[in-house]
Amino acid sequence: MSKIKETEIDYEEVERRIEVKELTNEIDTPDGIINFLEKRNGIHNFDFRNRYSVLDLVHCQRKSYYKQLGVKQEELLADVSGMWVTVRGDLLHEMTHAYKWREMDMEYKVTLDDGREATVAGRLDMYDWKTKTIIDLKTTKTVRWQIKHGILPRLEHILQVQCYYTMFSDVIPVENLNLVYADMQDIVTYRVKKNDLSGWIKTRIKDIEDSITRKSTPSGETSGLCQFCKYQSRCFDDGNGIEHKPLSAPKKKEDNENGS
């Protein structure tokens, strides 16, 4: 008759495991983590219709119109300076780590006249909780030169910060709005006047939605940013928009088939 080897039981370990089990309960992963991972992997589970970013509202309405229609974005004719703009922006945006409260997301609901609900998504660069200040960082080149020639500060940047004030002021206390322009040599900060843009936001969305209903392309709001737009060929062909040779082109057929 074979002998069964007895296994020594660690009763202290058993008791520890029981205690841990009683103190914890597995739940679903928080939505914030899931949303972060999905965004990093290009997964979006929301309907883009009736959904706008703050940038959609403060920049060209025609661009927002194309986006709402689902018009495919074109490929920019990239150059070295364009790549440097990206690198410069990445380097300077490291400054946002100066504040613990940074890259804060918010969704702001707007009820339209027909009862539909539109969503405006915004993200704060930085928030100083000590001084209750919203801080938005803009990276550019030749800051001092642009200020001297009246290019900076831009109206759309002012509207953007005021939109953040409108969206966030019911959630966090806001006493100051700061707009920061930075290049690799200079940093210049402006204090922006607080202004409730809830009515302006609703009107801006309504104008875009009305254009979609009428199937009438809004006029392009041309600016220096047009050279970075990914709808330039479409805008040029539709008229009342850019007049320069488009610096973007529809993606090649093989690229579309490969999903790139």
Q: What is the predicted role of each segment?
A:
Residues 134-136, 204:
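Active-site-adjacent bridging/hinge elements
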Residues 138-142, 182-185:
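Short connector loops/turns at beta-strand edges and beta->alpha or beta->beta junctions
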Residues 153-160:
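Short, conserved glycine- and acidic-residue-centered signature motifs
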Residues 119-121, 156, 221:
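A generic fold-level signal
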Residues 1-134, 141-148:
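Metal-dependent nuclease catalytic cores that hydrolyze phosphodiester bonds in DNA/RNA
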Residues 2-29, 151, 163-260:
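Metal-dependent nuclease catalytic regions and adjoining charged, substrate-binding loops involved
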